Structures are given as structure tokens and as C-alpha cells.
Amino acid sequence: MSDARATGQGRPHGAFLRHTVFRRAFFTFHGLCALLFAASAAATFRWCASMSAMGGMPMPGGWTMSMAWLPMCGQTWPGVAASFLGMWLVMMVAMMLPSLAPTLWRYREALARVAGKRLDLLAILVGAGYFFIWTLWGLAAFAVGVALAALAMQMPALARVVPVAIGLVVLGAGALQFTNWKARQLGCCREVPGCGCRLPLDVGAAWRYGLRLGLHCSYCCAGLTTILLVVGVMDVWVMAGVTAAITVERLAPAGEGFGVARVIGVVIVGEGLALIGRAVGLG
């Protein structure tokens, strides 16, 4: 009888301890994510402000080239690339963390049910793999941006069509929001860890899961990220709009993510048409 009473009293006590541990982990995790977001957002804002203060290079066609694609006085190209990649990574943390944090928390929760050890380390490795993919995309974006900037400076005829080209790129990015490919990639980004797939339980598997998640996310955000690059990589308002779009479509209730993506697509298509209209003198 005493054993039964002890067991009965132990269950509520054990449940209380588990709930306390869960709450502590929940608030610690999200508190650290909030601090990381605030720090990266502040650094990004400061970088954008400093780049805006430098101005840009006026180009044929009535547009201005960002100094992000050009070396400052005394800078070497490796230095320019390192500076761009550093700020790109910080910017990606600020932009992607609001939609990534819930996925990392669900992964940590699923891990706690079956493993119970190294939860934070494995979650960090998933995040590291995720942002490693975004760093690689940043390197590719820098190479393409520098090449296009050099061509635009050497070929005035090409520079004159850049405003129309930007509008067409934005229009294409908006159209991408309506495709089945977008829906599939968005579904992969919203997939709950451990549901229908093997849960990554070791260091290598966690890293690979982060890489896979980063790939799906970068594919899903391809159109929106391209808008950021062509419209204004140092424009705080463009950055905020792209971040909001990514977060809303990723965190929408189950079954509504693609619908939200299409609504965003309508807005982007409208903006693309407006940019083209202004470029050809219709607006």
C-alpha cells in the first residue's frame, strides 16, 4: 500500500519536474533566439546605414549602383568578399531566424522525447548547417553581383536596360510564388522533424539535416531573396518586407502556407509591373 501511495505521489511530482524543465528550456531557447535576432538585426541596420551614407554610383538609365559590389579605396577583392559574406551571414540570421526558430524548437522537442542528451548541441548544429548553406549562396550572389556590376560599368547600353531588367526579375519572382515547385519547397520547410522521416540523433545527422533544411529553405526563398538582391541589398525596408513575407508564409497555419505565398505573389507581380512601367516611362 505504501509503495502504491509513493508511486501515486511520485507521478505528479515527476510531471511537475518535467513541466518545469520544459518551461525553463522553452524560455531559455527562445530568449537566446531573441537576443541573437536583436543583435543581428542591429548589426544589419548599422551596415545598411553606413552603406547608404556612402551613396552609390550613378549609372546610365537613371539608377544607382550599390557600393556593396565595388571595392572601397584601399580594399582588396578578398577583403571586399570577406566583408560582404560577413554581413550577408549576419543579415541572413536576422531575416531567417524568425521562421527558423520554431523549426529548431520542434526538432529539440522531438529529440527530447527519444534521446534526452545533447539537445542544445544538436539543435545548434542544425542551425549551423542551415546558415552554412546560406553562406554558400551569399558567395555565389557576390560573384554574380560583382560580374554584373563590372559589365554594367563597361557597357553603357547594358546599364540602360537594368531598370527594366529589375522589373522583369521581380515579375518572375512573383510568378514563382504560384508554382507547384514553390509549394513543394514550402512543404519541406514546414515539415515537422520526426514526422514521416528519421529523426537526426547524432552530430553528423544533425549537421546533414541542417544542410538539407537550408537547401529547401533557400529554394523556397529563391524568388524573395532575388528581389532583395536586385531591388536593394542594403535597403532596410526591402529587407523588412522580404523577412515578413518569408516568415508569414512559413509560419501560416497548416494547409494555408501556399495560399499565403500566392497572396504575396500577387503583391510582388504588381510591384514588378509598376517597376517596368516606371522604367519605360509609363509611371
Predicted regions and their residues:
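Histidine-/acidic- and/or cysteine-rich, low-complexity loops and terminal segments associated
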Residues: S2-L89, R113-V114, A152-R160, T179-P200, ...
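Hydrophobic, lipid-facing residues on alpha-helical transmembrane segments of integral membrane proteins
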Residues: A34-A38, A82-L89, V93, I124, ...
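Interfacial loop-to-transmembrane junctions
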Residues: A245-G270
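Hydrophobic alpha-helical transmembrane segments in multi-pass integral membrane proteins
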Residues: A140-F142, H216, C220, E271-G283
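Interfacial segments of multi-pass membrane proteins
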Residues: R108-R113, G223-D235, A244-R250
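Juxtamembrane transmembrane-helix termini in multi-pass membrane transport proteins
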Residues: D3, G8-G10, G14, F84-F131
